[in-house]
Amino acid sequence: MLGTLTPLSSLLLLLLVLVLGCGPRASSGGGAGGAAGYAPVKYIQPMQKGPVGPPFREGKGQYLEMPLPLLPMDLKGEPGPPGKPGPRGPPGPPGFPGKPGMGKPGLHGQPGPAGPPGFSRMGKAGPPGLPGKVGPPGQPGLRGEPGIRGDQGLRGPPGPPGLPGPSGITIPGKPGAQGVPGPPGFQGEPGPQGEPGPPGDRGLKGDNGVGQPGLPGAPGQGGAPGPPGLPGPAGLGKPGLDGLPGAPGDKGESGPPGVPGPRGEPGAVGPKGPPGVDGVGVPGAAGLPGPQGPSGAKGEPGTRGPPGLIGPTGYGMPGLPGPKGDRGPAGVPGLLGDRGEPGEDGEPGEQGPQGLGGPPGLPGSAGLPGRRGPPGPKGEAGPGGPPGVPGIRGDQGPSGLAGKPGVPGERGLPGAHGPPGPTGPKGEPGFTGRPGGPGVAGALGQKGDLGLPGQPGLRGPSGIPGLQGPAGPIGPQGLPGLKGEPGLPGPPGEGRAGEPGTAGPTGPPGVPGSPGITGPPGPPGPPGPPGAPGAFDETGIAGLHLPNGGVEGAVLGKGGKPQFGLGELSAHATPAFTAVLTSPFPASGMPVKFDRTLYNGHSGYNPATGIFTCPVGGVYYFAYHVHVKGTNVWVALYKNNVPATYTYDEYKKGYLDQASGGAVLQLRPNDQVWVQMPSDQANGLYSTEYIHSSFSGFLLCPT
């Protein structure tokens, strides 16, 4: 009985070993028996056939060389130690997809040998490959013809204010037409009390007329002052232009204060007077801005014009980066052409329909790059296997070689929306698209950074004079300028002999005159007083005063050329002065008080009043130099309350302007000359401790 069971037990054990050895091999190999219970799964995404690698069969399908003792059937032994990996077997045929396993991903296998070259045939379009390396720049292509000019786009938002342009050339503009009277302005704050002016003559009160102001009437006799009347209603007229100062009237006797009389009724409106003489006006105050008018309707689009010439390259500043656009559909790779020169920017094309995203591909493990073999035939895409267990993400392998471009395939069915892929490198510039229709106006973007200053444009036509702007703040005090070069001596003046003046103080001894003709000897006389000054050389030119009282100037010599030397004109006989202003924005309507004197011969200039009183009659030269800041300036040189010359400067914002004027005047003793701003609407006279406005005058020749 025992001998009968022993061969049977050996046979059962041998069968068990065969079953254990063949079972895993069948499961791993994917035989027919293993795949009987799983139907092949079809996927929409075609799979690309890759290089055939070595099968991972280390340690499988080999017999274990272990002693097999005869043990009972129900006795289980301990698992033995793992055996050594056997030799690599030949690659088997590809089997059907097996049941998805639950194990961990294995190690990367070695690349297999290159297969024999296959037959070339037209394959189906595969998924987009990895972007290739940027090739060398191609030869420049032919210049394309300019495209058809597109329709004018919508008006963009206003840009940021640019930097102030350079100062233009100042030319006098044409006087504009009389503007529409503006609404009455708000009542201003009371200004500071001015200094009392010289008392003027009191004239008769005229009737309220509605015409233009007539010629000034003759001054009447001083009447008794009436009582203060009730304040009348506020007028609605605009302030008139400042008229020219009238001629000074005869000084009348001041009458005794009278009893205030009752307020009389307004008289009848007088007839309209003749138009007055055109006066020299000043710009009126700026009116209130009018309400903003409604925006006009959009005009009809004009006819398409001919294509314009290519303009010069602009120097615009970069705009703000726009929002990130949606990822477009992956296009079919086209044939690589020669790289041409970048074409001109075309008009935006019409937005195409958004393509459907392809299905996500199965993540494969990147193998080590093998040696480049000959290209094999592209096989048919096999049926997709069931999704495997996601493996551990491997390191990114090197970029593969660029494949041959395939023929565009037919449009497939829309796949499910895949996850967003990584951002690829920047592609080559595409061809210029067709001009698209105007898009919907987007929302206003944020204000961009201040761009670089552009090149100054061409000077535009002179505009009409603008309204008077508000006075700006006083700027910081600048540095004193460099001393100017001394001017050339002027030509000798042609004056007539004046009347003999009053005897001045005794001057220094003059240069001895040339000896005269010897006369007959006279009787000896008593000792006389000191000799009179030497003869005055009429060809001398006034120059610099010397400490000894003489004048260093030029003398006309031979040929009319000046010869510099020591003249004989006494400094005590030449009234002259120079005064500067050390405070900005003096009051208008009264003499400007140049408060610091640099030289004041004969003390003819009074810095407390700003008036020069003529001490010696003769021909004088006066000059004034002023700085302008904050607003326009209108300066006049007055002689005995009558303007002699006017100077007007239109202020440019952001600059410190200069204005000057001068005149030669004939004065009698006690005549008065001063500088004054006639209007308070153009009173931008500026001066500081280190930026001086000055007033000078000196006697050219006595009369």
UniProtKB/Swiss-Prot annotation:
Induction of expression: Some up-regulation in diabetic nephropathy.
Pfam families: C1q (PF00386), Collagen (PF01391)
CC per GO annotation: basement membrane; collagen type VIII trimer; collagen-containing extracellular matrix; endoplasmic reticulum lumen; extracellular matrix; extracellular region; extracellular space
Entry's Gene Ontology BP terms: angiogenesis; camera-type eye morphogenesis; cell-cell adhesion; endothelial cell proliferation; extracellular matrix organization
Name of the protein in question: Collagen alpha-2(VIII) chain
Species, as recorded: Homo sapiens (Human)
Disease implication from the record: Corneal dystrophy, Fuchs endothelial, 1: A corneal disease caused by loss of endothelium of the central cornea. It is characterized by focal wart-like guttata that arise from Descemet membrane and develop in the central cornea, epithelial blisters, reduced vision and pain. Descemet membrane is thickened by abnormal collagenous deposition. Corneal dystrophy, posterior polymorphous, 2: A rare mild subtype of posterior corneal dystrophy characterized by alterations of Descemet membrane presenting as vesicles, opacities or band-like lesions on slit-lamp examination and specular microscopy. Affected patient typically are asymptomatic.
Assigned keywords, A-Z: Angiogenesis, Basement membrane, Cell adhesion, Collagen, Corneal dystrophy, Disease variant, Extracellular matrix, Hydroxylation, Repeat, Secreted, Signal
Signal peptide: 1-28
SUPFAM superfamilies: TNF-like
Mod. after translation: Proteolytically cleaved by neutrophil elastase, in vitro.
Segments of this protein annotated with the region Disordered: 70-544
InterPro entries membership: C1q_dom, Collagen, Collagen/C1q_domain, Tumour_necrosis_fac-like_dom
Region listing for Nonhelical region (NC1), in residue ranges: 537-703
Effect of P575L: In FECD1; uncertain significance
Function, in words: Macromolecular component of the subendothelium. Major component of the Descemet's membrane (basement membrane) of corneal endothelial cells. Also a component of the endothelia of blood vessels. Necessary for migration and proliferation of vascular smooth muscle cells and thus, has a potential role in the maintenance of vessel wall integrity and structure, in particular in atherogenesis.
UniProt biased composition (Pro residues): 79-97, 506-532
